[in-house]
Amino acid sequence: MTGEMSDVWIVVPAFNEAGVIGDVITDLRSIFANVVCVDDGSADDTGAIALGAGAHLVQHPVNLGQGAAIQTGVEYARSQPGAQVFVTFDADGQHRVADVVAMIGRLAAGDADIIIGTRFGPGVSRPPVLKRVVLQTAAWLSPRGRRLGLTDTNNGLRVFNKTVADRLNITMNGMSHATEFIMLIDENRWRVAEQPVEVLYTEYSSAKGQPLLNGVNIIVDGFLRGRMPR
């Protein structure tokens, strides 16, 4: 399968994920030859473990935030010969490789520039009740997200083509990059579609995850920065 996916680059932003990053990279590498882990100033062995598992490694000397790590990873990936398809994939084990394969197939249909995962599509498990309420509220509070017909604006699993990668310029370094991603899709008129995905809420990922209200905070931050229409 890796030969068929030679034009695909997986970007994995990681911060202090030594406990799981090896398995995450190994799972990805079973399908994809090209995985770049951006070690965002981790204090543990995240970078060394990712490198040992077969990932390309780019390191930030200090923690800059997930948005900055994604931008660094995309810049690295888009500079590689033959790179045509780009994926953002969380480092904490929440995302499934099978969903990435399905999303790449959806992108190959050619009627979208970017595919975003959704936890609210048919045939997939829903998040826990409180998290579901917060995520759906965050999506409802996003004018651009509503206009684009998106149901899960904070989903970190994305697959996009080189048109998007070449123009991507994330400036919100932290978790608010999810808001900016939606803004960029809208402003650049990139064609967007959603793909139902499973998100695995393990004990580890739940402990590492953002507070429940973070989804709403991301939208509020976008308003305060003036990056979204009021």
Q: Which residues make up each language-model segment?
A:
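Cell-envelope/extracellular polymer assembly enzymes that use nucleotide-activated donors
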Residues: 7-9, 180
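Short, well-formed alpha-helical segments that are part of the catalytic scaffolds
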Residues: 12-31
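Conserved donor nucleotide-binding strand/loop of the catalytic core
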Residues: 36, 47-80
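A conserved acidic beta->alpha catalytic loop
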Residues: 39-48, 93
